[in-house]
């Protein structure tokens, strides 16, 4: 880390919940550590099993569909790269935002958001399921790395600033809020992370990661849709098609009006790299045009936020709660329009919806089977947690933790081998 960046974060930001001894396996006479605390944290996330499992978890289409599918892992790598570039522009620590991008979906269950929905249905009466809260649970509890003085897992034992950078929704489950970042039994760790922070306000690094996430999946989901033949970008220049798309978008993203989205379609249709894609036919020239489009749109959206934030916050390194990320409303509308393209032409397809229904049923049936045979049906780590759980709610949470940890391949193997017994 440069001296300027090192000085902009203090010991409070770099504190870990559990103090760790110096490394002991180095050769005599060698220096044991050249990295910053946040570089070490990034390495811990990069090397953890929970991140690797994202390679077999759905982004939009399944990880085994198509020749070069995007998975939750490839998406996370893309978010990390976009966020890192933005961090450099703002003066945030690049490793801090990079690790937030890597970890931002680390709690996603099999089948992505569809799997979230199924698990939430199962445990709704005991605190619900939310991928962001599961992120925090994995990083602070479930991923094995460090034990506290009582022998309990501290997860990866990341620094306070690193954990806060992953917290897009830094509050527990609340009435009227669909998203949340912490389960009830993880609140002690959450309160340690958020000590002294403005209530319900994500730090700047988390805001950068969140926008990088929006940019990555809006642009790349459209890229995948164009390659698959499901999305034709020429609809943006068709007034009737754009109006229909804007109506769908305004219903799904109610902070914007149809007029906002029609205007966004008109602007994007006039961007030369968008028009150059035309009718995608898979040729070399078409593929180059599409890749140019994705690269330039990522730059368009990321740089607009950087410039707008600097206009408000001024020069100098920005960190933690020094500033809010400012995203121009016109740019936000363009990103929402791209999300709507994927929603309309990929996610609303009747075949896709049927696949999703089958996936949710599969998760429900696996949960029933694991519950009926627990703790014998659980992995050793989860079996011990199940045996120590004080009540049915805590025991069901352990079962949900195990299912959320599954790759899609493993979930399907367990489903095929299941022998369910009814819940009591």
Curated annotation (Swiss-Prot):
Keywords, alphabetical: Hydrolase
GO-annotated molecular function: dGTPase activity
InterPro entries: dGTPase (IPR006261), dGTPase-like (IPR050135), dNTPase_2 (IPR023023), HD/PDEase_dom (IPR003607), HD_domain (IPR006674), PHydrolase_assoc_dom (IPR026875)
A matching Pfam family: HD
GO-annotated biological processes: dGTP catabolic process
Domain HD: 72-218
SMART domains for the chain: HDc
Signal peptide: none
Disulfide bonds: none
Family that this chain belongs to: Belongs to the dGTPase family. Type 2 subfamily.
Record PANTHER family: DEOXYGUANOSINETRIPHOSPHATE TRIPHOSPHOHYDROLASE, DEOXYNUCLEOSIDE TRIPHOSPHATE TRIPHOSPHOHYDROLASE
NCBIfam families: dGTP_triPase (TIGR01353), PRK03007.1 (NF002829)
Annotated protein name in UniProt: Deoxyguanosinetriphosphate triphosphohydrolase-like protein
